[in-house]
Regions:
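Gly/Pro-enriched, hydrophobic low-complexity segments
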Residues: 26-28, 171, 176-290, 294-296
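Sec-dependent bacterial lipoprotein signal peptides
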Residues: 1-26
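Extended beta-sheet lipid-handling architectures
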Residues: 62-66, 86-88, 98, 105, ...
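Extended lipid/amphipathic-ligand handling interfaces
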Residues: 50-54, 90-95, 117, 237-244
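Buried hydrophobic packing residues in well-ordered domains
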Residues: 64, 103-104, 124, 162, ...
């Protein structure tokens, strides 16, 4: 009888593998736990996703009397990176459209105000209570310069950074110069829709403005990225612990990364209150007698 040498060699190879692995035709099964967020991913149209981004337009004011803030600054010197982390501190926050904010940070032990930040329009005012100093400047300033040469003018944080994180700018649906795209993404934890907003630029260019990542099991915004005209990320904002307040979904945690400004601000927020009425002087802040006032150009 004639035998095919190839078949004999293949059969011997299979037998050898079975002996070495001490397995005679058995199969190894592995169980993988798929995260619930992936299993429960929902579908949404582009119009529905745009509504999710824009639905916060119905909120005129927001406040939270129970927040915790943690600030980390980053300084680069050559190949070295120096991180300075400030302890988590309690406080409260109040916001009013279109551009008013009041943020108070308190001493963690005695709950006395340590820092008060008020911003209306382009002007911000900061009162550092313990240092008896009062700063006045512009949110639009890339660099804060003071005539007082003794002052450290490195104040990278701006009220606008916080405002745009809490109140994401809505997407203009009828602006002919605005374009937006929808794609799908997935990681080990969840599935996402990603909406990227562009603006028509010079010649054939389109310029990225903002990007929203929407987690599909809850259809909530989990991340927002904001770009400058060169396509660099100026704000990378992560949202988590969403909570339903009235008819709105609001985050319990907001992490603001400002890579070009060299700082990160993490906010843990409880007890959101929607559309309350504020006093007329809520967003006013004047220096008290005897305090040193530093004005930035």
């Amino acid at each position: 009888m004639a035998y095919n040498k190839t078949n004999i060699s293949f059969g011997l190879a299979v037998l050898l593998i079975a002996v070495v692995t001490n397995c005679t035709g058995c199969k190894k099964r592995t169980t993988i736990n798929v995260p619930r967020a992936i299993l429960q991913a929902r579908s949404a149209t582009l119009d529905e996703l745009l509504h999710i981004v824009n639905r916060l337009d119905g909120i005129r004011t927001l406040k939270a009397s129970n927040i915790k803030a943690e600030y980390t600054s980053e300084k680069k010197e050559g190949s070295l990176i120096e991180l300075e982390k400030y302890p988590r501190a309690p406080g409260y926050i109040m916001l009013k459209r279109p551009d008013s904010l009041r943020l108070v940070i308190q001493n963690p032990v005695i709950k006395k105000s340590e820092l008060t930040l008020v911003s209306v329009g382009d002007e911000f005012r900061v009162w550092v209570h313990g240092r008896h100093k009062f700063y006045i400047g512009k949110n639009s300033s890339e660099e804060l310069i003071s005539d007082d040469l003794e002052e450290d003018t490195e104040i990278p944080i701006r009220a606008g950074h916080i405002f745009e994180a809490v109140f994401p700018e809505s997407i203009p649906l009828n602006d002919p110069d605005i374009r937006f795209t929808k794609i799908e993404e997935e990681d080990a934890y969840a599935k996402y829709y990603v909406i990227t907003v562009y603006r028509n630029g010079p010649s054939a260019r389109i310029l990225p403005l903002r990007e929203f990542r929407i987690e599909r099991s809850g259809l909530t915004i989990s991340r927002q990225r904001i770009f400058n005209d060169d396509g660099q990320v100026v704000s990378d904002i992560h949202y988590s612990d969403p909570e339903q307040i009235d008819k709105y979904t609001l985050p319990g945690k907001i992490n603001i990364e400002r890579p070009l400004d060299g700082y990160t601000l993490e906010l843990e927020i409880k007890d959101w209150v929607v559309n309350s009425v504020f006093k007329d002087d809520t967003f006013s802040l004047e220096p008290v007698e005897g305090i040193k006032v530093i004005r930035f150009k």
